[in-house]
Amino acid sequence: MKDELFKQNPKKQFEFDKSVASVFDDMINRSVPFYRENLELCGNLLAKILPTNASICDLGCSSANFLIFLANLRKDFKLFGVDNSASMLEVAKSKAKAYGLDISFFEANLCEFDFFICDVFVANYTMQFIRPPKRQELLDKIYKNLNSKGILIMSEKILYEDAFLSKNIIELYADYKEKQGYSKFEIAAKREALENVLIPYSQKENLNMLEKAGFKKIESIFKWANFETFIAFKD
């Protein structure tokens, strides 16, 4: 379905409810620049470097796009998805079933989730929705539950510290969304709905959190304006 949620009756505050879940795939493909290309980059990299039967847990898996891509790349992967939205998980499970894929899903608040040891954790556009006081604690848990030489892939919308640059990047992003078919009204309405829900950090703040959690080797593998993907290695 096409995302027209903010066309007439803007939501007071953004949440991943049934209305969002029903249009999520269209929404994210039109709202996150190079979403599919970045998803494939990360998936192909993991498929290339991970050992047989590697376990991968997608934290904030939404409609399972990344997990489904991974499952089709390597049949030996052990795949898990966690999300706090029942509506999003309903879509994820339906898609996995339609493709005949064996993916385990958990409905949980990530800050309260009973983590288990994995080779890879993925947090694509997830940390930005976690309340700031809880982010470091969550990253600490992720690091603790990674196997030796484990990997975290983390994609985030980021802030620029320079006000002039930030203003112009935000305007370029709005231009991008207009080219994807969103009206100025829809863009403004969604921005208002996301205020105090999606709280981005700067690149430096994200790197500091990763380092504080214990990651020593951190690289940026994708960036477009105010969107960036980090890969961090344990040990």
UniProtKB/Swiss-Prot annotation:
EC number: 2.1.3.-
Disulfide bonds: none
Protein name (Swiss-Prot/TrEMBL): Carboxy-S-adenosyl-L-methionine synthase
Catalytic activity: prephenate + S-adenosyl-L-methionine = carboxy-S-adenosyl-L-methionine + 3-phenylpyruvate + H2O
InterPro entries recorded: CmoA (IPR005271), Methyltransf_25 (IPR041698), SAM-dependent_MTases_sf (IPR029063)
Binding site for S-adenosyl-L-methionine: 35, 60-62, 83-84, 124, 191
Top-level class of the enzyme under EC nomenclature: transferase
Summary of the function given for this chain in its UniProt record: Catalyzes the conversion of S-adenosyl-L-methionine (SAM) to carboxy-S-adenosyl-L-methionine (Cx-SAM).
Quaternary organization: Homodimer.
GO MF annotations, alphabetized: carboxyl- or carbamoyltransferase activity; S-adenosyl-L-methionine binding
